[in-house]
């Protein structure tokens, strides 16, 4: 398995902590802060995991917004991509974890893996749901932090084969 690039953007530190947990669980990965990343660095990986918190009511975190603006759909075309979104399903029930939706819109030009069921979450709506599943792993550190490690473990097992 080639090295996986795990790219994250964060304001509170939660997305970085999740990226580190995923790196530890999956092994052979490099964790990269998008605030310091370059397009060339991104394009040096064929396998990436993109970890993005949701800002406010469904917006993409600022560092991700800036970095995503430097990338084209073609930058994703030859990649295998896992998406991980963070959100607060209680406070932002109608836009839960929509930060990853904005990335998914470009990432779907490549091979997106790791869709997960919405079971166990309580929210009204989310653009991050397609075909009844989240477009990636969704973490709620505000309300369900006790489930984070188990969700990461299950998701890593699910996607490992796709990253082989």
From Swiss-Prot:
InterPro entries in the record: Flavodoxin, Flavodoxin/NO_synth, Flavodoxin_lc, Flavoprotein-like_sf
The molecular function terms in GO held by this entry are: FMN binding
Question: Where is the Flavodoxin-like domain positioned along the sequence?
Answer: 4-160
Q: Which cofactor does it need?
A: FMN
Cite the SUPFAM superfamilies for this sequence.
Flavoproteins
Q: Which Pfam families match?
A: Flavodoxin_1 (PF00258)
Q: Which PROSITE patterns match?
A: FLAVODOXIN_LIKE (PS50902)
Keywords attached to this entry: Electron transport, Flavoprotein, FMN, Transport
Recorded superkingdom: Bacteria
Note the NCBIfam families from the entry.
flav_long (TIGR01752), PRK09267.1-5 (NF006739)
Function noted in UniProt: Low-potential electron donor to a number of redox enzymes.
- Which family would the database say this protein is a member of? Belongs to the flavodoxin family.
Its recorded name reads Flavodoxin
Q: Which organism is it from?
A: Helicobacter pylori (strain ATCC 700392 / 26695)
